[in-house]
Amino acid sequence: MPALLAADEFLAAARQAGFTAIDLVPPEHWARVKDCGLQISSTAGHTSIELGLNRADQHARIEHELRANIALAAQWGIPNLVCFSGSRHSATDAEAAHITAAGLARVSGPAAAAGVTLLLELLNSRVDHPGYQADHTEWGLQVCTLAGAANVRLLYDIYHMQIMEGDVIRTIERAIGSIAHFHTGGNPGRNDLDSSQELDYAAILAAIAHTGFDGFVAHEFIPKADPRQALQRTFAECGQALDGVQPE
C-alpha cells in the first residue's frame, strides 16, 4: 500500500479507476482488499530478498514459510507467491541455478495442488538490489527449466530488466512461456509510465497482449503527483494501448 494514501483511500481509488486486483498486499490488508471487491494478485512467498533460494542452508526456512503461505494463498484465493533468489555468494551462476531450482521444487507440488504459482522475481543488481542473483532473464529461465514444474515461473519486472539488459519486447516474446506475472515502472526512477521516462509502455503492453498472456500486469511505480490521478491515467492509457490488439 502506498504511503501517500491511507489503505482504504487507495483501494477505493484503484477500484474507481477500473483495476480488478492489487499486487503484493501485506496480510493485514487482505480483508480490506476483498471487502472492496478486488482480487489479491500476489503476495510474498517468503522473507528476505538477500538470503534466498540460492543458498541451500536457507531451504528449510524458506520451505516452512512457503508452505504456510501456500495454505493462506489457497484460503484467500491468491494465485501467486513471489520468491527471491537471494544475493550472490560463493556458488557459480550455474551452481546457484541448480540450488534455487531445488529449493523451488521442494514446494512446487503442494503449491500446484493449491492452485498457486511460485514466481521467481527478476530484479536489477545495478541500482536497487546490489548482488541479487536473478538479475537476468536467461538465468531465471534456467531455474524454471531445472525446477521442472509448470507452476514455477518468472515475475518479469520490466523496470528492473530494462536496467539490466534492455531488449524488453523481444525478451518477453521469447520467454513468455515461462512468465506468469509482470511488474511495470518508469525508468529511470521507478515513477509514472509517462513520457519523462524511456520505456514505451504502449508498445510493450501491446506486445504482451499479442502473445495471448492472460495473467496480471501489476503497476509497481511511485507516482510523482496525486496518486489518484496516476491510477486513473495509467489504467486509461494502458487500456488505450491494448485497444484492438489481437492475440496470436
Question: Across the structure, where does each feature detected by a protein language model lie?
Answer:
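Conserved beta-strand positions in the central sheet of alpha/beta enzyme cores
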Residues: 21-23, 41-44, 82, 119, ...
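Active-site-adjacent beta->alpha loops and helix N-cap segments on the catalytic face
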Residues: 27-38, 91
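Active-site acidic/histidine proton-transfer and metal-coordination neighborhood
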Residues: 52-153, 163, 246-248
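Histidine-acidic metal/acid-base catalytic patches
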Residues: 1-15, 77-79, 139-156, 160-248
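Catalytic domains of carbohydrate-active enzymes, especially glycoside hydrolases
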Residues: 8-30, 69
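Active-site-proximal loop/turn and secondary-structure-junction residues that shape catalytic pockets
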Residues: 2, 26-28, 46-49, 87-89, ...
